[in-house]
Amino acid sequence: MAPLKIMKTASLVSFIALAIAVTLYHLSHYGVFKTLAVTAGTSFYHFFVRLVVGIYIDKVKQNRADITRSWYRIRPWETAFYRRIGVKNWKDKMPTSFPEYYDLRKHTPLELAQVTCQSEIIHEVNVLISVGALLGAVPFGMFPAFFLSSLAAGCFDMIFVVMQRYNRSRLMPLVERQRRTAGKTGSGTVQGNKIGGTR
């Protein structure tokens, strides 16, 4: 099942579970149903808000990020770090919502680099969303449950942040090579974060 479909299904299932648990709690006032409602509600929050964030940023950015911005630049220490944790060995085993975005046969290195920037931002926002879930502990208590679920969700998103920055570190030499080639041959012009003649 595609990751996007999993997110939609998980959002729907957790919402239904939340509605059932809340109803049963109001009818019986059993504490177990309150616990189930909080669990289902937290799950719904993590899945649904991530789904909305991903769709929104995809619509707004449309894979046209400015790769020259400081936030997207790969720092000198990152290459050694990614090598040490073996990103190359496990990144292809992780799910991808839109694999067609990462096809070098269909897109230029610049376009792929822009995709990695957009994906990185989505997952970084998701990390903040995970932290936001801790606010649920204020009215409901159960801080350990909120903390552990937020920590797990945030760490999961950070894996994808690392992946996208690693991918971009591999793509940037290709982008620069294409930029130099375009400048020498006159087949394209460089304007902002786009290379003319590649679209």
Regions found by a protein language model. Give the residues of each.
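Transmembrane alpha-helical segments and their cytosolic interface motifs
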Residues: 111-141
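Membrane-interacting alpha-helical segments
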Residues: 144, 148-152, 156-176
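Cytosolic-side membrane-entry/anchor segment at the start of a transmembrane helix
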Residues: 1-39, 162-175
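Hydrophobic alpha-helical membrane-embedded segments
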Residues: 28-80, 157-161
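Membrane-proximal soluble regions of multi-pass membrane proteins
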Residues: 55-112, 169, 177-197
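Residue-level signal for alpha-helical transmembrane segments in multi-pass membrane proteins
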Residues: 21-25, 49-52, 129-136, 140, ...
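Transmembrane helix interruption/hinge and helix-loop junction motifs
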Residues: 27-32, 137-145
